[in-house]
């Protein structure tokens, strides 16, 4: 089964959370994933959401483009991916919803570069999975 699968099962099954959210960072690229009950079956239930933020000064775009971009069509649970821009994840959390803005800089080499919202998502209470807004 593997450690990660076992950990996910324990975390999600034992806690009975209606829409768990994982937020993590600095993979040198930005992601939004649906967490699936069983990844080999793309039609399995969505049980949560993961938001991954990059570092504001990340600069490994070419590597991640080669490593990941070609596999996105095989991973329909990926809702957003950006390997080119450094940035951060901005969250606004209430009891009703979790709103996320994927904030990314136009340039990591220019300290005066604009930071803009590349994508926005919402996770509603009791409804697992992120919806793009």
Where are the regions a protein language model picked out?
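Long, structured stretches of catalytic cores involved in phosphate-ester chemistry, encompassing
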Residues: 1-133
